[in-house]
From Swiss-Prot:
Protein name: Cell division protein SepF
GO biological process: division septum assembly; FtsZ-dependent cytokinesis
Protein species of origin: Clostridium acetobutylicum (strain ATCC 824 / DSM 792 / JCM 1419 / IAM 19013 / LMG 5710 / NBRC 13948 / NRRL B-527 / VKM B-1787 / 2291 / W)
Gene of this entry: sepF
InterPro entries: Cell_div_SepF, Cell_div_SepF/SepF-rel, SepF-like_sf
Similarity comment: Belongs to the SepF family.
Amino acid sequence: MASKVLNKVMGIIGLNDEDFDEYEDEVMEEKAIARENSYDYDEKLNDKNSSNSNNKVVNIHTASSVKVVIVKPKDYDEATQICDDLKNRKIVVVNVTDLEPKTAQRLLDFMGGASYVLNGELLEIDKGVYLLSPSNVDISRDLKNDLASKSIFNWSK
């Protein structure tokens, strides 16, 4: 009889065992749904990671897009265009033989600063002729030494 009274009091207060069971069922269902959603997310994430790690495709068009620009500037104002070409990852050959020595030096200083900032390289090919190469291009100096030693081209006047 005491249990009947206790059940009635709990029913009035709202603490029936049936309510607890329903509440526990709801909590368990929510946890199961949450686990399913997180499992799907983790599974998709793992699938993406495994496909990226197995992907060894190299874009072959990157090497063919290298362009060479040959410039013979008439004044210092063309320095920005030369450096823009370098910034756009183009190889630039600059001939400053027709410029005044002071203007050529200013232009060379500007190009040297730009190539340094862009991790490029500035090489003197001949007196007054310079090669600016972007960071994605490697320049070999062996050819110049070989040609000079064989006297085919006298690069070192």
